[in-house]
Amino acid sequence: MFRTSDAFSSFAVPDIEAARRFYGDTLGLDVRDSDESGLLEIHLGPGAPVLVYPKPDHQPAVFTILNLPVDDIEAAVTDLNDKGVEMERYDVGGSTADDRGIHRGNGGPAIAWFTDPAGNIISVLQDTGG
């Protein structure tokens, strides 16, 4: 019924150029113009890219829109902080964040959340090799 190999996700931002700078320059991701319609593609590896589309009346997502596994969460948070990105703190099933904003325990990998310029929630999480 569905061809999952062609499945993709997308999210909205009010300012496509701010998104291009944040995802490309700040996060160092492979960001490309999708076509002449003003969409961006974030290429994260094999498979379909994540589409980013402009929406003037954008409302930030209240959930994590993108999870980025990293080999060293401490280094990733340091790098983000050095680039002016601040970690968010959430109540996650009783776990609390350390002074750097990294949540540990609660049965999952170490994780830290931050927002893009549009207020969408993103995470970096310790890659557990799974």
Predicted regions and their residues:
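Intrinsically disordered, low-complexity N-terminal regions enriched in serine/proline/glycine
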Residues: 21-22, 52, 89, 102
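Conserved short beta-strand elements that form part of the metal-binding/catalytic scaffold
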Residues: 30-71, 88-89, 107, 121-126
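Core segments of cupin and vicinal oxygen chelate
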Residues: 4, 10-49, 56, 75, ...
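Acidic active-site catalytic centers that drive phospho-/nucleotidyl reactions
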Residues: 15, 72, 116
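Generic N-terminal initiation segments characterized by hydrophobic and/or small/turn-forming residues
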Residues: 5, 24, 48, 60-63, ...
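N-terminal beta-strand motif that seeds the catalytic metal site of vicinal oxygen chelate
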Residues: 1-18, 63-66, 125-130
